[in-house]
């Protein structure tokens, strides 16, 4: 189910404050965050945000095409390494 249009998009308060501070200073700096549920808003465009994937922080450069998506969509949490090989020969 999508979020109601009456509500604003969710952005973590600490993340919003950091971005607004960098926008007023006109600086570019990597912002480290664990907030994967935060929605990307237009004020984030041009910033690099390091999003936690459960193991490490992946730096993601925010572009205008990402607006409206969640931060967690761009930091995959699992790596699929393929299915186990068939060991029928070794069992015989």
Curated annotation (Swiss-Prot):
Q: Which GO terms describe its biological process?
A: ribosomal small subunit assembly; translation
Which NCBIfam families is this protein grouped with? rpsS_bact
Q: Tell me the gene name.
A: rps19
Q: What does this protein do?
A: Protein S19 forms a complex with S13 that binds strongly to the 16S ribosomal RNA.
Alphabetized Pfam families for the sequence: Ribosomal_S19
* Chief location category: plastid
Membership in a protein family: Belongs to the universal ribosomal protein uS19 family.
User: Which keywords does this chain's UniProt record carry?
Assistant: Chloroplast, Plastid, Ribonucleoprotein, Ribosomal protein, RNA-binding, rRNA-binding
Q: Which domain of life is it from?
A: Eukaryota
Q: Which InterPro entries match?
A: Ribosomal_uS19 (IPR002222), Ribosomal_uS19_bac-type (IPR005732), Ribosomal_uS19_CS (IPR020934), Ribosomal_uS19_SF (IPR023575)
User: Entry's HAMAP family?
Assistant: Ribosomal_uS19 (MF_00531)
* One CC-aspect GO term: mitochondrial small ribosomal subunit
Species assigned in the record: Platanus occidentalis (Sycamore)
List localization entries.
Plastid, Chloroplast
Its recorded name reads Small ribosomal subunit protein uS19c
What GO molecular function terms would the record report?
A: rRNA binding; structural constituent of ribosome
């Amino acid at each position: 189910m999508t979020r109601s249009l009456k509500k604003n998009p969710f952005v973590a308060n600490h993340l919003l404050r950091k971005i607004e501070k960098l926008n007023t200073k006109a600086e570019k700096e990597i912002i480290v965050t664990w907030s994967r549920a935060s929605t990307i808003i237009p004020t984030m465009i041009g910033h690099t945000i390091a999003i936690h994937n459960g193991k490490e922080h992946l730096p993601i450069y925010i572009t205008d095409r990402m607006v409206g998506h969640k931060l967690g969509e761009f930091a995959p949490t699992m790596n699929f390494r393929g299915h186990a090989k068939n060991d029928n020969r070794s069992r015989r």
